[in-house]
């Protein structure tokens, strides 16, 4: 049986990376929410 999680750095960065987050309004909201909460890591 194939496992469901097959990690790929490029895919991860394109979907969850900082620049991907900053590209959309909701993504920026996510970053701001994590900043307000005081997260050490804002994105992957």
Curated annotation (Swiss-Prot):
InterPro entries: Ribosomal_bL34, Ribosomal_bL34_CS
Keyword Ribonucleoprotein annotated: yes
Key words, A-Z: Ribonucleoprotein, Ribosomal protein
Keyword Electron transport annotated: no
PROSITE patterns found in the cross-reference section: RIBOSOMAL_L34
GO cellular component, one term: ribonucleoprotein complex
UniProt cross-references to Pfam families, sorted A to Z: Ribosomal_L34 (PF00468)
Family: Belongs to the bacterial ribosomal protein bL34 family.
Classification via HAMAP family: Ribosomal_bL34
Protein name (record): Large ribosomal subunit protein bL34
Protein encoded by which gene: rpmH
């Amino acid at each position: 049986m194939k496992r469901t999680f097959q990690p790929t750095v490029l895919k991860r960065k394109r979907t969850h990376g900082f620049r991907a987050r900053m590209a959309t309004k909701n993504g920026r909201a996510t970053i701001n929410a994590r900043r307000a909460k005081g997260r050490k890591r804002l994105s992957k």
